[in-house]
Amino acid sequence: MLTAEEKAAVTGFWGKVNVDVVGAEALGRLLVVYPWTQRFFEHFGDLSSAGAVMGNPKVKAHGKRVLDAFSEGLKHLDDLKGAFAELSELHCNKLHVDPENFRLLGNVLVVVLARNFGGEFTPLVQADFQKVVAGVANALAHRYH
């Protein structure tokens, strides 16, 4: 559970995030750093190298879509399970995504935020975001239990 101060820090910081850029980089990095996650995206075309993944327009578009959903979830920090219920159902029952991938993506997102915002992404802001991405990963994994 986040305090009111932590919620304000996360939502305030998120307003600075370009979801197109950060989403593309986060999903691309996930697919490069954890190549076994590529099996869910084989229909995206060329994922044969880091350069191919990072430049792939389908990866970029889906990364934006992922962060659009994350952005929507930030509006419901007190009910992440409710906010992500439909996506949890989809990823569990239809797509059969390993729920560990949600945790991996959350951690990659934190890395990308740190890379893009440098000193502005302070240890305290990181701590707040780590709580949020853990909560989102838990919410997305909810239908698996």
From Swiss-Prot:
Keyword Acetylation annotated: yes
Highest taxon of the lineage: Eukaryota
Keyword Hydrolase set for record: no
UniProt xrefs under InterPro entries: Globin (IPR000971), Globin-like_sf (IPR009050), Globin/Proto (IPR012292), Hemoglobin_b (IPR002337), Hemoglobin_oxygen_transport (IPR050056)
One Pfam short name: Globin
Subunit structure comment from the entry: Heterotetramer of two alpha chains and two beta chains.
Name of the featured protein: Hemoglobin subunit beta-3
Organism of origin: Odocoileus virginianus virginianus
Gene expressing this chain: HBB
